[in-house]
């Protein structure tokens, strides 16, 4: 089963990075390939959200239920989308009050080979660039 794991050391606090990753409504403003996002349910400890991605004329929507551990972790579980399985999450590890390590880990499997052929490479590129996109977003938002 394909896996993606990316991390970055950033000069921003765990609170700042957690807030950015949890701000699903802002994703289309800065995430490559993200054309829309919606929060379907939200509480202090969980969120269900849908994200629309499009690249090279291929568009897909996937929905995840996210378990929120404030300023530490966001666990993701597939609700709906072109996957048989999608699990993973974000970890925020404090290095100092002004710096942290951000890590994204995803395990996924598409519903069938046709979808994997059409969308697999695109999804891997998009998911692989997410940590960098959030790092650049943090510089825009917090270094102003």
Residue ranges and their predicted role:
Residues 78-128:
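Beta-strand/loop substructures that line and gate deep hydrophobic ligand-binding cavities in soluble
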Residues 136-144:
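Short, highly charged C-terminal tails/helix-capping segments
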């Amino acid at each position: 089963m394909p896996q993606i794991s990316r991390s970055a050391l950033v000069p921003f606090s765990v609170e700042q990075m957690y807030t950015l990753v949890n701000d699903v409504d802002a994703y289309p403003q800065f995430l490559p390939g993200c054309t829309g996002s919606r929060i379907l349910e939200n509480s202090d400890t969980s969120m269900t959200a849908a994200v629309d991605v499009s690249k090279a004329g291929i568009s897909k929507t996937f929905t995840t239920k996210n378990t929120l551990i404030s300023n530490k972790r966001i666990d993701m579980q597939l609700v709906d989308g072109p996957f048989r399985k999608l699990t993973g999450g974000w970890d925020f590890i404090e290095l100092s009050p002004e710096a942290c390590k951000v890590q994204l880990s995803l395990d996924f499997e598409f519903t069938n080979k046709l979808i994997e052929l059409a969308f697999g490479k695109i999804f891997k590129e998009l998911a692989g660039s997410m940590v960098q996109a959030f790092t650049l977003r943090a510089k825009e938002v917090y270094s102003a």
